[in-house]
Amino acid sequence: MKIIKRSGQENTFDGNKITVAVRKANKEVNDNLRLTEEEVLAITENVTKVCSGMSRALSVEEIQDLVENELMKTGKNEVARKYITYRYKRALVRQANTTDDQILSLIECDNEEVKQENSNKNPTVNSVQRDYMAGEVSKDITRRFLLPEDIVRAHEEGIIHFHDSDYFAQHMYNCCLVNLEDMLLNGTVISETMIERPRSFSTACNIATQAIAQIASNQYGGQSITLSHLVPFVDVSRQKYRVEVAKEFAAAGVELDTEKIEKVAELRVREEVRRGVQVIQYQVITLMTTNGQAPFITVFMYLNEVPEGRIRDDLALVIEEMLNQRMQGVKNEKGVWITPAFPKLIYVLEEDNVGKDSKYYYLTELAAKCTAKRLVPDYISEKIMLREKGDVYPCMGCRSFLTPDRFTDEGVGNIAKAKNYDENKHKYYGRFNQGVVTINLVDVACSSKKNEADFWRILDERLELCHRALRARHDRLLGTLSDSAPILWQNGAIARLAKGEKIDELLYSGYSTISLGYAGLYEMTKYMKDASHTSPEGKEFALKVMEKLNEACNKWKKEENIDYSVYGTPLESTTYKFSKCLQKRFGLIEGVTDRNYITNSYHVHVSEKIDAFSKLKFESDFQKLSPGGAISYVEVPNMSNNVEAVISIMQYIYDNIMYAELNTKSDYCQCCGFDGEIKIVNDEDGKLVWECPNCGNKDQDKMNVARRTCGYIGTQYWNQGRTQEIAERVLHL
């Protein structure tokens, strides 16, 4: 049995320490007020039983809470008071040096919580440790100086989650859609070096990856680019090769007609496309940003984003190459082809590619094969997105969607001073998200004690708390100068503001968004209605709650001219934090708080049996009410030999839901070469670990495991809460 120390280190549980602590408190009171030795040992025994009955390692604070409860039960209040006083004094000492232990445990790789905090960061690497160290300082400053005390307390108690406090000390936003078109066509500056318009497709791809790395180092969330911004440079290369081929053959004394020159030039174009796409794939996963990780980058593949004709065919060529290279994968250190985490790919299902007789159906077949093998691409339905948002555009990274462009419609104009702005078109690239605060809906429900009137009252109070926390995020960005991140604010990724100019205008009028996240809709409904939200009564209640969240955002938006938007929070590591806080506040409630995770956003519970099509149809009603971003998924077995089934799901997505993905497994054991599913098992301490079913290997450094984690693919393992959630996922097909 393990415990988690305050520093984050994982240690073996030692009941004797409880006995020693209680004896110390016992000695400080008069003889007639003391516990008997039997009572002291009974306290240790009772606490040990509770700890062993939990399916996770408890923190020191949680164990001390249990000791306090047991002391109070004995009726020996003086002993309990001495124990509580001693604990309080120790807490004051620790607060004098709030970050020391955390940082030291990071450096020595002893911090178990940090090891599993981010499934795409390796905490043993120096650059990651530096980022985490800076993050600890930022969190400390945020906690002590930058946020109101009640918001800090609500965050620490798991009532809300103030996302990314490890970056809040700086004036940084969350995620964005990169205006790569402006940067490439009109030039940019990277690291104080002028970058002019590229003269080939491969050069454009190289510039794009350099820009991606710079952007990632100046924000903390994901970013997205679209291939349609790169594709004009395919024809630039084509024109160059036509001239080169003609010159080369003329110099060699070989006569060639125009048709033959075209054929040879086209062969060179295809090779250049292959090289350019390879640059994107390998640069993205090998570049290291100041965040200590590869950039969280999404590549958008949408044929209808360019006009019909040569340029659309060129875009199809680039998409085909992107899918082929992703299907192949990348080699790990052993030289084995594996699934990379990035870039995330999004493929738009549209009229020209979804039907078997459509012109680009071959790309859809290729996308299906790629998904079956490598978990990507994910899918956006052009038909549904046009109906719901009026335009088709990518999410910013994983799932955060911009609100439809209203600033152009309202005549606000080119406030970003972009060189490619068109007042007759809606603008999405060059826009961003200011940040996220998430409400824990399960806590709202449990706090109401099943009284519906109290539920709605508490929800109103918590929403106002979230509103104030979101305003803190917004106010932190107000007054930010463009000099803080020239690649973003001055050189085209977001804007082309002058040096020393404030970014304030970009925070209003719908140019950027700010997100009210939510989590635990399933558990909330389960507690209030004793039923899943897939039941008729449960669904009605859950939808009312979603409508309430949207009403709040719309009210704030109208009053402040800031685009608040409801967001289906992915909760990578926070799912574990929320579950621990719920267990501490409300105990173990069957089906509600008895797991080490809570369900992301509106999702059907991972253990609930439901077929893929019913799940997507059901969740589509909730996705509409998450305009700030959400994604649905279906869990499927190995589909490499059943691509037709994948295509049938894709076609269902096209007709029924805006944004969805398929989850499968992609693993490799470096000890025995096993490439089936690596399993999750309990070790001797009851901890969930990964094990090769073929050879029994449990060394995470000697296996490659890829699982979908909240929209992205995770490859660096997960905390105990998320690991339990992965283990409990049922197949939907």
Language-model-detected regions and their locations in the chain:
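Conserved catalytic cores of very large enzyme subunits
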Residues: 89-93, 99-510, 531, 535-698, ...
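Amphipathic, well-packed alpha-helical segments that form the structural scaffold of globular domains
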Residues: 23, 467, 471, 522-526
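Conformational switch/transducer regions in large eukaryotic molecular machines and scaffolds
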Residues: 14, 681, 711-712
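Contiguous, well-ordered alpha-helical segments that form the cores/surfaces of helical PPI scaffolds
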Residues: 514-527, 547, 708
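Metallocofactor- and cofactor-centric catalytic cores in central/energy metabolism, strongly enriched
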Residues: 273-277, 281, 526-527, 722-728
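Long insertion/accessory domains within large nucleic-acid-processing enzymes
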Residues: 694-733
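Charged, amphipathic alpha-helical regulatory modules used
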Residues: 1-110, 727-732
